[in-house]
Swiss-Prot record:
Name this polypeptide is given: Probable indole-3-pyruvate monooxygenase YUCCA5
Family affiliation: Belongs to the FMO family.
Pathway(s) per entry: Plant hormone metabolism; auxin biosynthesis
Gene it is expressed from: YUC5
Cofactor(s) the record lists: FAD
Keyword vocabulary terms for this entry: Auxin biosynthesis, FAD, Flavoprotein, Monooxygenase, NADP, Oxidoreductase
Source organism (scientific name): Arabidopsis thaliana
InterPro entries, alphabetized: Auxin_biosynth/cation_transpt, FAD/NAD-bd_sf, Flavin_mOase-like
Amino acid sequence: MENMFRLMGSEDSSDRRRCIWVNGPVIVGAGPSGLATAACLREEGVPFVVLERADCIASLWQKRTYDRIKLHLPKKVCQLPKMPFPEDYPEYPTKRQFIEYLESYANKFEITPQFNECVQSARYDETSGLWRIKTTSSSSSGSEMEYICRWLVVATGENAEKVVPEIDGLTTEFEGEVIHSCEYKSGEKYRGKSVLVVGCGNSGMEVSLDLANHNANASMVVRSSVHVLPREILGKSSFEISMMLMKWFPLWLVDKILLILAWLILGNLTKYGLKRPTMGPMELKIVSGKTPVLDIGAMEKIKSGEVEIVPGIKRFSRSHVELVDGQRLDLDAVVLATGYRSNVPSWLQENDLFSKNGFPKSPFPNAWKGKSGLYAAGFTRKGLAGASADAVNIAQDIGNVWREETKRQKMRTRVGHRRCISVA
């Protein structure tokens, strides 16, 4: 690539370390956040390199999502900068459609990531004023690289690593199948089987719905309170309605209106084992980042008894689970819909922008920029819209510096050229 230059290394096969200077920022992660940042940098005329540990873009969507998943929000709030979704796409694009959109996006902006490059560490070198990013190849070569650059964009996202809870007996005694929701594809293989879904977020609800649709005997563990909202209210998405209301009313009133509308549409959910938090859905989202569940059909299955809500787990044994209320359920499989976490602390050697939980210390919209050329894209807890906002800000910030320095370089070149002519 024209913006990468090999600095040192050996042709000897015993020396697998290569050092590469990147003339522009390095973006870690080729998901939607990384692609959006790359596209905006391309528009700014700034060269870049994208490092991706998988062998494809958007690996979370391509390899770690179930077949039936769709975008939970309308496409117009999920599109990336500079390129809308195709007009013939539905309001809530499918998994396949979203992947095709991202592939078209990468092609349009000529984004060609360095695949199978797993970042082991990234640190800022105070002496040189540059970032040093060490990677290993996940391919058979096992080669090692060190990328050196002035700017580093962390775009590995909020969902880089799965969260697997420690539950008594789950891995030591239970003999049935145990998978994380990132490994779940379809309920077809569980037809007629008893499956426990651990977790009641959007993934847990959707997996439970899919299991019920495939005639599995589905139970879902709900340990804590949860906000469930209809995905649409009077033909408009709950998200759009909440954003509109927040322009005119205080947050507490917006939450009150949303909860009244949810009660009118979904009814009283407490009798089904779903208690609401004391804090309203939008306030809770802003304060903690916890997203309300948008119902796409799971509540109907819960009300009909096709999906059973159960309390917390006490322990697992060979073929069943004992719950905290004394119930015992015979099980064939367990799906852990227990979410994901950021993996930034495992490789980024920095403590200014990011906190120990792998998220920026500052809240949105001020979480995209750190010191020494460090940036964060897609850690806003605001979904794709937040990632797009980060991408635009990052590209403009780097672009301003890039253009100014390019202008100065041209001026120095002109001055030097004139001196040469006068001497001649």
